[in-house]
């Protein structure tokens, strides 16, 4: 592979081990756009030409272009080609441009090591909801009128104290309601004094990483696993060690055999992301005992725990913890709506003061009126009723998804049994490349994600992540038909 291209001003290092080629090539293109080597409005070479020049599969280059398009860095013009957008989405990464057009951008800024690590990763933005978008609730049926009434009533009754500010830990009545809810629904053992109200699990991860990790500290993560956690840990300089997942969850024995003990372990035991495995009780107890003996802290992301369609739920790791090694996080954003930006973090008693201090320094507290409205929504019973209704709706949509997939995608995509959550993994027929499949699916207005995007190691089997909760039955059936057409166009090796 040439180090210096002739058609684009790129200097390409060897791709990092475990990084998908399309992601590596996308990062190099994005960096060149951001630092001005590829100017706004510039026309990019054809994907076929770039693939030939850099000795890449054309599907790899196409996938890189699709990622850049989805994030607003480039745009396609029919009959003309692909061009860099005039206004880039990363305004914060560019200090600005002078009136004469000379760049005074971020190349002159002495970024910290944290910032340099952080900017390796792409941003995220709003996307159109369509089949089979993962990680999104059914926003089309959220009770907006009821929510508006609760918010309006709370605003009318707002006291001067509520309007002036509050505790860094969060609105005390909401913390009490969250503690009671978690004790009843998830077996979490905590007082309201251990609960922090935050904006989301991503913030919880960043808070924990800054407080608990020094550069070089080892962190274990499920593989495949949640990339948002990987981003946070690497940004603070931690060394991330991927640990494979088997039928019982994170493979503890594999991790002990291949890695030294960890400072922190991140895990999604209720519904492993993205494979959907529920960690067995036996594995949970073994994990807790190992953490106690090795003095490792566990960050439990109770992802998708609210929606289970088969079997009895297993209590959260935190509820089984007798040694105070578990930090527990969950969110209302996926249960209610993403723009709510309210979640919760439960920390061992000895950690409360440090976490509260960090909260006060960084954001003081989450919006108090929103916290108070959510508290009313919970204590008046609306939240519990909403979860019951949504569990029934998602079960119905899951049935439609499975029926449509099996009738139209048989021989192309194998859908395993789904026990919980809002999405599942579909295993592609032998010879079909997941990245190529995702590109073809996008052309057919279907959103699927290659499983390799979540894995640091080479995946043993090609798979796609598919959501079934965000759209109605008609769109699910349309999606199955369109995905089948897309997969039928994919070459097999």
Task: Describe each PLM feature range.
Residues 136-139, 246, 272-274, 304-307, ...:
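Short histidine/acidic/glycine/proline-rich micro-motifs that form metal-
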Residues 1-153, 350, 356, 360-367, ...:
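N-terminal basic, amphipathic alpha-helical segments
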Residues 151-295, 306-307, 312-323, 394, ...:
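Conserved core of the PLP fold type I
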Residues 320-354, 369:
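Active-site PLP attachment segment
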Residues 344, 372-380:
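Helix-loop "lid/cap" segments that line or gate small-molecule binding pockets
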Residues 137, 269-273, 334, 471:
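Short glycine-rich anion-binding loops that position phosphate/pyrophosphate groups of nucleotides
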């Amino acid at each position: 592979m040439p180090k210096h291209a002739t058609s684009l001003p790129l200097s390409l290092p060897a791709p990092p081990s475990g990084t998908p080629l399309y992601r590596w090539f996308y990062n190099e293109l994005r960096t060149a756009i951001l630092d001005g080597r590829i100017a706004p409005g510039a026309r990019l070479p054809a994907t076929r030409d770039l693939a030939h020049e850099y000795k890449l599969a054309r599907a790899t280059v196409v996938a890189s272009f699709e990622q850049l398009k989805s994030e607003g860095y480039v745009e396609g013009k029919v009959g003309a080609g692909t061009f860099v957008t005039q206004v880039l989405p990363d305004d914060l990464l560019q200090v600005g441009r002078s009136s004469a057009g000379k760049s005074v951008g971020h190349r002159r800024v002495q970024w910290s090591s944290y910032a340099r690590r952080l900017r390796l990763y792409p941003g995220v933005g709003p996307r159109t909801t369509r089949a089979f978008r993962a990680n999104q609730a059914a926003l089309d049926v959220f009770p907006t009128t009821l929510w508006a009434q609760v918010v309006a009533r709370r605003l009318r009754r707002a006291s001067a104290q509520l309007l002036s500010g509050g505790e860094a830990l969060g609105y005390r009545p909401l913390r009490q309601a969250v503690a009671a809810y978690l004790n009843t629904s998830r077996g979490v053992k905590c007082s309201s004094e251990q609960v922090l109200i935050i904006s989301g699990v991503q913030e919880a991860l960043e808070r924990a990483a800054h407080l608990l990790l020094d550069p070089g500290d080892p962190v274990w993560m499920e593989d495949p696993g949640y990339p948002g956690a990987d981003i946070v840990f690497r940004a603070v300089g931690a060394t991330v060690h991927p640990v494979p997942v088997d039928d019982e969850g994170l493979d503890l024995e594999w991790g002990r055999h291949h890695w030294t003990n960890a400072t922190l372990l991140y895990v999604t035991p209720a519904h492993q992301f993205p494979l959907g495995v529920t960690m067995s009780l036996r594995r949970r107890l073994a994990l807790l005992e190992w953490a106690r003996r090795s003095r490792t802290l566990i960050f439990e992301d109770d992802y998708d725990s609210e929606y289970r369609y088969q079997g009895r739920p297993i209590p959260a790791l935190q509820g089984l913890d007798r040694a105070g090694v578990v930090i527990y996080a969950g969110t209302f954003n996926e249960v209610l709506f993403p723009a709510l930006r309210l979640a919760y973090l439960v920390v061992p008693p000895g950690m409360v003061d440090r976490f509260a201090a960090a909260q006060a320094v960084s954001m003081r507290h989450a919006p108090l009126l929103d916290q108070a409205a959510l508290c009313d929504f919970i204590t008046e019973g609306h939240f519990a009723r909403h979860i019951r209704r949504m569990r029934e709706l998602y079960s119905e949509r899951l049935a439609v998804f499975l029926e449509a997939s099996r009738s139209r995608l048989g021989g192309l995509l194998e859908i395993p049994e789904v026990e919980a959550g809002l999405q599942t993994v579909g295993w592609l027929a032998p010879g079909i490349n997941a990245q190529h499949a995702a590109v073809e699916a996008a052309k057919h207005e279907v959103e699927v994600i290659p499983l390799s995007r979540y894995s640091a190691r080479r995946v043993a089997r090609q798979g796609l992540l598919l959501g079934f909760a965000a759209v109605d039955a008609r769109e699910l059936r349309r999606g199955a038909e369109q995905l089948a057409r897309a997969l039928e166009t994919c070459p097999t090796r």
